[in-house]
Regions:
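Short acidic, Pro/Gly- and aromatic-enriched capping/linker segments at domain boundaries
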Residues: 131-149
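An acidic-aromatic
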Residues: 70-129, 175-176, 180-191
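Gly/Pro-enriched, hydrophobic low-complexity segments
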Residues: 65, 84-94, 105, 148-214
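N-terminal leader/targeting segments and the immediate start of mature chains
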Residues: 3-81, 204-222
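Tryptophan-centered short beta-strand motifs
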Residues: 114-116, 155, 216
Length: 222
């Protein structure tokens, strides 16, 4: 092979390697950028739905975790009044909170006991897993987002650094959360919490009335 041919071949190889390097560099830059853009669009969509739902100020839902305690909590919220109905096998407890009276009442129906105390809770609806500004930035940059059905509902599955969240596409509300693991009877399983039966604008003032403590032994710490 002539010296000129060798030079030509080497030059051709250099051009090829430059093209390959440019393609790889472009892929390294473009693919993550596209991912961030897609993530941003989805997260913004969830946030818009959440804000619309929060503005309703009238909702209820049920929380159930796969824990050994077998606790189910029903949460009701309307115009500054919040009520929890906590069920643990045969034991029930009701917690009622009012922003207007700054009052919190804990009721144990089976024991006919109640405690009244001052409510210093934050004046918000406290919906779980709402996406704030800082969380939004993290999710957009570091999440893997796919679509998945949970209990028949279309959801966005957001895997953010090991914390996996499923958000309803229609309401933006959290439907399911998976975070860490637990060991039960020597078996390691994922810690899963489900947020079910979301309902909006169905609660009435009667539903959220202060508990009737007639016949209860009441401890007043207000």
């Amino acid at each position: 092979m002539k010296k000129g041919d060798i030079f030509f071949m080497e030059k051709k190889k250099m051009k090829l390697w430059k093209k390959i390097a440019f393609t790889v560099l472009a892929a390294v830059i473009i693919i993550p950028t596209v991912g961030v853009i897609v993530n941003a669009s989805i997260i913004n969509e969830i946030i818009v739905s959440q804000r619309k739902t929060i503005n309703e100020q009238n909702f209820s839902y049920t929380v159930q975790a796969n824990s050994a305690e077998n606790i189910t909590t029903k949460i009701y919220y309307k115009d500054g009044t919040k009520m929890y109905v906590i069920q643990n096998n045969d034991r029930n407890m009701i917690m009622w909170k009012s922003q207007s009276t700054d009052e919190m009442i804990n009721v144990v129906p089976t024991a006919l006991k109640a405690t009244i105390s001052k409510c210093d809770e934050d004046k918000t609806a406290n919906i779980p897993y709402l996406i704030d500004e800082q969380t939004s930035k993290t999710m957009k940059l570091s999440s893997i987002i796919t679509s998945e059905k949970v209990n028949g509902e279309d959801c966005y599955k957001v895997n953010n650094l090991g914390l996996i969240l499923w958000y309803s596409k229609s309401t933006g509300m959290i439907v399911k959360a998976m975070n860490g693991t637990m060991t039960t009877d020597g078996k390691e399983t994922a810690c899963v919490t489900e947020f079910k039966d979301w309902k909006f604008n169905e609660l009435t003032d009667t539903d959220m009335t202060r508990p009737n403590l007639t016949g209860y032994k009441v401890t007043n710490n207000a």
